[in-house]
Amino acid sequence: MRYLILSDIHANGAAFSAVMNSTRRKRWDKAICLGDIVGYAAEVNQTVDRLRAIKPLIVIRGNHDKVCSGVEGDERLAKFSRFARTAAEWTARKLTRANRRYLSTLPKGPKMVDGAFAIAHGSPLDEDAYIFSDLDALRVFRSTDFPICFIGHSHFPVVFSWDGSEVQMQIATPPEFRLQLDPNKRYLINPGSVGQPRDRCPLSSFATYNSETRLLRIHRVRYDIAATQASIMSAGLPAPLAERLSVGR
């Protein structure tokens, strides 16, 4: 089966549109979203509505989805950065009742998909924890048994592989990263962020994966950054949330 893997859209409507438009040239059978549909940018309900319209679709929750929908409150919100907190509070006010309910009922990862791979927002051991390094990945590999897990949260496109003795880290460099997955290795794969890339490349990032051929691709797509920046500023959200999009940080 051919999968479209999205993560960390963060209410960036222009980026989401660019990604979905680009996938018209890439055949896929099922879409996966690794969470953080909202937060940071201003196209809140438009983004949730568009995601919900995709069929077939499997979605798990992210930390921003939890906070903005009220699943987690002030204690979790206090751990956000100042700008993220401001955006989360604004987002919570803007969500429609239907979309707030939708976000609040999203399942927690890790979750198996078609017996082919697992999905999680952050670490499979803790949905709010980041996987940045080979040591972070090693802890997960030693504590789990899935062959492949797609993760998000860090906004950094990267592949960690483990052959049972050593973890290798491969940064997914633009414009397209391709990897034939080895059946004798295990993988943690981050497709990067649709809406707020942080690898110093402003291009929107997502993945496609063919479970039959075991071919992984991480794609980069240009989008109208200025349009997203304008909507963020027009909403009265913090300027750094707009400015960072130009540099992919």
Predicted regions and their residues:
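Active-site-proximal beta-strand elements of phosphoester/diester hydrolases
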Residues: R2-H10, A116-S123, L188-G192
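Core catalytic region of metal-dependent phosphoesterases/phosphodiesterases
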Residues: R2-R100, S104
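Conserved beta-strand scaffold positions in the cores of enzyme catalytic domains, especially
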Residues: I5, V59, C149, L188-N190, ...
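Active-site environment of divalent metal-dependent phosphoester hydrolases
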Residues: H10-A15, G39-A41, H64-S69, K111-M112, ...
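His/acidic metal-ligating clusters that form di-metal
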Residues: K26-R27, R93-W162, R249
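Short, conserved loop/helix-junction motifs that constitute active-site signature segments
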Residues: R52-I54, F141-S143, L181-D182, Y209
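Short, well-ordered secondary-structure micro-motifs
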Residues: G70-E72, Y130, F160-D163, Q229-S231
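Acidic, His/Gly-rich catalytic cores of divalent-metal-dependent hydrolytic chemistry
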Residues: G164-R249
